[in-house]
Amino acid sequence: RPADGLLKTIAEKASQPAFAGIGMGSDSLYLVPFAHNTLLDGYNGHLPWLQSAPDPLSTVTWQTWVEISDATAEQLGVKEGDILRIESSKDSIRAVAYPSPAVPPNTISIPFGQGRKHGSEYATDRNGSESSNVMDILETTTVSGTGSLAWAGTRVRVTKTGESISISKLEGNVRAEEIGILPAEDIIKTIAPENA
């Protein structure tokens, strides 16, 4: 089969990813930056109506947030709204914590798009706790053989600053809750089809 040769060749060229930044110690985390839904890579940061458009998953607006797994947040003693310092060997930024059940353990995610240094007042001159640029801490690690920038090739250290603010978001609680925990939910049990 011709495909066997191609797949074998691809598999032989595979390698483990190379990471740069903070060492592989127990206190370092993987940084996975992602494109902001409306601000993109910051191109639209000067438009206030796009700054105020909520992210479709977190519903955060106007701020740089760091998504952190619930388990990692608990381990670090991080609560929603805590201002975190995210440090790579290149630089550090500050962002507001957003614990999420969707983030893998030992990983943080930060959107591109905020923290611009040039542009309109909507894109610049904002508090570093609310508007930081993840590009400032990305290492310039490249993918072997292609020369492409390894976007998720940076390890970072996260520490609490001792400050906390409210996250500018539209959602309430994203956690799944068992029905029947609150006394007011008992009515749901009484009107269930099997009880009718």
Which residues are covered by each model-predicted region?
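A cross-kingdom feature strongest in bacterial/archaeal respiratory oxidoreductases
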Residues: 1-196
